[in-house]
Regions:
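An amphipathic, hydrophobic-aromatic interaction surface with interspersed Lys/Arg
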Residues: 1-262
Length: 262
C-alpha cells in the first residue's frame, strides 16, 4: 500500500487530498475489487473508473487525459490478471460466507462439486453454471454440502439445498458474481503453485486473457480423479470424501509427481 497526494485548484484556491493506494491485487478492498470487476465487464470507462476508485472530489469529475494517465500509472498492476491468491476478497454476500483462506473447512467432495461447476461455466459460459458454482462456494454458517454416510454424532449442521440456493444466487448483482468468478480464477492459480502436478498451469496465457470467460478450461473429470484416488479402498470412500481438500491435493500431487518419475 502506498500513499498518494493529489494537488488541485478550485476557484483559484489550492486543495489537496491524500489516498491510500493498493500496489497489488491482495490489497484491494471489496469496494475496489467490485469496481475492477465492473471495468473488466466493460461497464465503466477509464475516467469513471478512476474517479470512483480514487474517490475523487466532485470538482475533479472531468479529469483531463494527462491527469488520467498519471492516475492509471498508480494502478497499472490491474492490467495483469495472472494473480495467485489464497483467499476471497468478498468475504460474504448477505448471509452467505466465502471459504476462509486456503480453502480451510472445504472437504474434498465439496471442492469437487465447486470446481466441476466452475469448469462447466468456463467452457459453456452458461449463467446457470456460474450460479451453481457460487451456490456451492458461498454457503451459510452451519451448512454442509455432503452428508456423512454414517455420522458418529448428531449433526449440528444442515444440508445445503443446492437447487434452491442456485435460484437465489441467480438474482445477485452480475458484477458481484463476476467478481467471485475472477477471484476463484486467482484461487486456482494459487493451487497451481501449491500443487503443480494436480493443477498444471499454462503460463503462456496472455496476461489480459486470464480470468476472462472465453478462456477455455481443460476437461477435468473429478469423478475419475476421485476413483483413482480411492482405488480398491472402497470401504474408506467416505474418509476420502470428508478429507480436507488441501490434504487430498497434497496426496494426489505426490502420487502424480512420483508416477511421472517412473
Amino acid at each position: 500500500m502506498k500513499q498518494l497526494r493529489l494537488d488541485y485548484r478550485v476557484m483559484g484556491c489550492s486543495r489537496s487530498i491524500i489516498r491510500q493506494v493498493p500496489e497489488r491485487w491482495t490489497e484491494l478492498t471489496q469496494e475496489q475489487f467490485l469496481l475492477v470487476a465492473q471495468m473488466y465487464r466493460g461497464e465503466l470507462d477509464d475516467s469513471t473508473f478512476l474517479q470512483r476508485f480514487f474517490r475523487l472530489p466532485k470538482q475533479l469529475k472531468n479529469i483531463d487525459e494527462f491527469f488520467q494517465y498519471h492516475l492509471s500509472e498508480q494502478v497499472e498492476f490491474l492490467v495483469d490478471c495472472r494473480v495467485r491468491m489464497d483467499h476471497f476478497i468478498i468475504p460474504s454476500v448477505g448471509k452467505l460466507q466465502a471459504p476462509v483462506a486456503r480453502l480451510k473447512g472445504i472437504n474434498f467432495a465439496h471442492f469437487m462439486f465447486i470446481d466441476t461447476a466452475f469448469n462447466h461455466y468456463v467452457r459453456n459460459e452458461r449463467d446457470a453454471d456460474l450460479d451453481r458454482m457460487i451456490a456451492l462456494l458461498y454457503i451459510k454458517q452451519g451448512e454442509i454440502v455432503v452428508l456423512p454416510d454414517n455420522p458418529t454424532k448428531p449433526l449440528s449442521s444442515h444440508l445445503l439445498d443446492v437447487r434452491k440456493r442456485t435460484a437465489e444466487v441467480a438474482k445477485l448483482d452480475p458484477v458481484v458474481k463476476y467478481a467471485i468468478f475472477l477471484n476463484y480464477v486467482f484461487i486456482k492459480r494459487w493451487l497451481s503453485k501449491a500443487f503443480p502436478f494436480l493443477f498444471p498451469l499454462d503460463e503462456s496465457d496472455d496476461k489480459e486473457e486470464v480470468g476472462k470467460k472465453k478462456t477455455k478450461a481443460p476437461l477435468v473429470s473429478w469423478l475419475d480423479i476421485f476413483d483413482a484416488f480411492v482405488g480398491d479402498d472402497i470401504a474408506q470412500m467416505e474418509k476420502y470424501q470428508q478429507m480436507p481438500c488441501t490434504t487430498a491435493f497434497r496426496l494426489l500431487d505426490k502420487r502424480i509427481r512420483d508416477a511421472q518419475k517412473k
